[in-house]
Amino acid sequence: MAQHPQHHHGAGGSTEYRGVLERMNRFQEPEVRQAIADLQLPMGSYGLDVGCGVGLYALWLAEALGPQGRVLGFEPQAERVAVAQRQVSDSPAAGRLEFRQGDGTALPLADQSCDWVWCSDVLHHIPDPVLALKEFMRVLRPGGRVIIKESQVAQALFLPGYPDLERQLQRAEMAFNRHEAGPRSIQERRQRTPESMHQAGLQTWHLRTYMVQRQAPLDAAARAYIQHTVFERNWGPRLRGLLDSRAWQERTALCEADSPQYLLTRPDYYCLYPVSVFSATVDG
């Protein structure tokens, strides 16, 4: 997950935010790999990962394309380009992966030069997503595909049995994020992907949603993502001023690892997290 240089997200190119990206990628890995397989991208094809973040999605895409397939990842920040290059350096697919610094709204590529464009958890950060989608369409060959993945965070369940508290936390997070997304929160913008696709001229689009579901005992990837990204970052101290004292105390009791009521060590814990893949084909 990444964004264009003028659209900051989280801690930007910092080490802390690189950790956020990798934790999310690893948490969703089985479902994202399945989504990539279900796309049935042509063997040996050439595609883009716009906003490639730490490079894991680009790697999984390359692995799905066979020995002749190639993936070019774009990131606006040089630091993340270097991280992505290091991330894949030991993979057998490394020779088929390239990472460049670039803006997804102005790709430095010729018209009709690639077979597909993948953009994961990025489009909602771009102030003009229609402009970005039209740029994706420009570089696609006739019959090429635009593929937008969005994590449906507003529909996620991380506090089973505490729906009122979870709704309060989600509303507070939406309010906090409006300073970045403008009048619409990031969560709202995620849900408007088909609207943007339609406005860009992608009249026929397809949706497939994958449910990330984890249960106790949690594996390391799930626990790291839920604890460090959801509980500590998304629902951490930055929301304290947006919640009443009772809600904050309940959040602390359930989400802090040293609390007797800590959820993630309970044998009955589970979580649900929908991930949607929107795709459309460019007319020939």
Where are these regions (language model features)?
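A short acidic, Gly/Pro-enriched loop at the edge of an enzyme's catalytic core
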Residues: 105-116
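N-terminal, positively charged/glycine-rich alpha-helical extensions of SAM-dependent methyltransferases
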Residues: 1-18, 26, 30
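Conserved catalytic/acceptor-binding region of the Class I
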Residues: 147-220
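A short glycine-rich, Lys/Arg-flanked "PGG" loop and its adjoining helix->strand segment in the class I
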Residues: 130-145
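Conserved Class I S-adenosyl-L-methionine
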Residues: 206-284
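Conserved alpha-helix/loop element of class I SAM-dependent methyltransferases that forms part
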Residues: 26-43, 60
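Class I SAM-dependent methyltransferase SAM/SAH-binding core
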Residues: 46-50, 54-106
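A short SAM/SAH-binding and catalytic strip from SAM-dependent methyltransferases
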Residues: 115-130
